[in-house]
A protein has these predicted regions:
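Membrane-interfacial helix-loop segments of redox and metal-homeostasis proteins
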Residues: 1-356
């Protein structure tokens, strides 16, 4: 095997260990905060996308209290969160293509699509009620030293336990379909090679497109260009290491495996050091209300991600791999977050705004 082939097999095709990847994500998230002034987060931007869609029907969501709080000016191409998420999706797609890991995959049961939609809505609603998901109210929220993130983390773990119990109900269990895979494994080696070669070329094309997109944003703003590059890094890391906080939380209650949870804690510990340094140098931390919204939102988020089968990072990279189920989960996330914006005047005044 040539040096180039060995490099490709080791670093582009094989999945990476999640532990060092999570540490790298912790380091990168701290630098992202220091450079852009905001934390690595996604559900706020997804809610803005919902606001844009609502505006197509003649409504004025920019006048709603929630969008005055999180902002709705411009387009996803003009906002730090927007271009970062586009970078994440491109980075995950590029990594999956280079690994020959992209194919259109439908769930074995249509019931799973409905389950993904409902779970996505619950998770999106809980995330925006708590002002953050497994990123902004957990992985990057705790390093901000915001008390609400600690409450959200504990509530999410409890919600994941409830979600596991719900998924074990007989009417939610999907029957296994067993079949022979011998022909697909051994019958068309040459076809598999051609497919891998095509996907590698497509991955390179996506990488070129991503670099061009970053250059376009750099032409407007240094911060926007850097946000694209960080998004590419985030997306590539989560796809190669298959980072999913849902799996980590679910495994605590089903198999007792803790390796992913340890990796998340270590990544947050590293991020705490970097984030503290950025704050000491003058960056403003993102602090949110420590109210019932953080606890209720965490419980709902924990239930939702287990029912849906993936958290924010999990569904994003799986969607780029061609898993249709997670396209539906993403749509559910946008719907759930937007529902919080619709009802924020009632929710916020009772669950969030009166609290420190």
């Amino acid at each position: 095997m040539s040096v180039l082939s060995d490099f490709r097999e080791r670093y582009l095709v094989r999945f990476w260990s999640p532990l060092p990847a999570l540490v790298a994500l912790g380091v990168a998230s701290a630098y992202y905060f220091a450079i852009t002034g905001t934390f690595w987060a996604v559900t706020g931007e997804f809610t803005r996308w919902g606001g844009h869609i609502i505006s197509w029907f003649g409504y004025t969501p920019q006048e709603w209290s929630y969008f005055k709080l999180i902002g709705l000016a411009g387009t996803p191409f003009d906002r730090i969160d927007g271009v970062m998420i586009i970078g994440m999706l491109l980075g995950a797609l590029c990594a999956a293509l280079w690994a020959n890991n992209v194919s259109l995959r439908w769930p074995t049961s249509r019931r799973r699509l409905l389950q993904g939609l409902i779970g996505g809505i619950i998770a999106g609603f809980g995330a925006r009620l708590a002002m953050g998901c497994n990123l902004a109210a957990f992985f990057t929220g705790i390093p901000m030293f915001s008390l609400h993130a600690w409450a959200f983390m504990l509530a999410t773990v409890g919600g994941a336990w409830v979600g596991v119990k719900i998924c074990l109900l007989p009417w939610l269990r999907t029957p296994l379909k067993v079949g022979s895979q011998a022909s697909s494994l051994f019958g068309d080696v040459e076809g598999t090679r051609r497919r891998a070669s095509l996907q590698a070329r497509l991955g390179t094309g996506v990488a070129v497109l991503a670099i061009a997109f970053a250059a376009w944003r750099f032409d407007t703003s240094l911060v926007l260009g850097m946000a694209v590059l960080f998004g590419l890094l985030f997306g590539g890391l989560i796809e190669r290491a298959q980072i999913c906080f849902t799996s980590a939380a679910r495994d605590l209650w089903t198999t007792g495996r803790t390796r992913a949870a340890y990796g998340i804690l270590l990544g947050m510990a590293v991020a705490c050091v970097g984030t503290f340094g950025a704050i000491a140098l003058g960056a403003s931390p993102k602090i949110f209300w420590m109210g019932p919204n953080a606890i209720l939102g965490g419980v709902l988020f924990g239930i939702g991600i287990v029912v849906a089968g993936g958290c924010e990072t999990g569904w994003m990279y799986r969607a780029m791999e061609g898993q249709v189920h997670f396209w539906v989960v993403g749509v559910g996330n946008v719907i759930g977050g937007t529902l919080v914006a619709v009802y924020w005047d009632q929710l916020g005044t009772s669950l969030a705004l009166p609290y420190p």
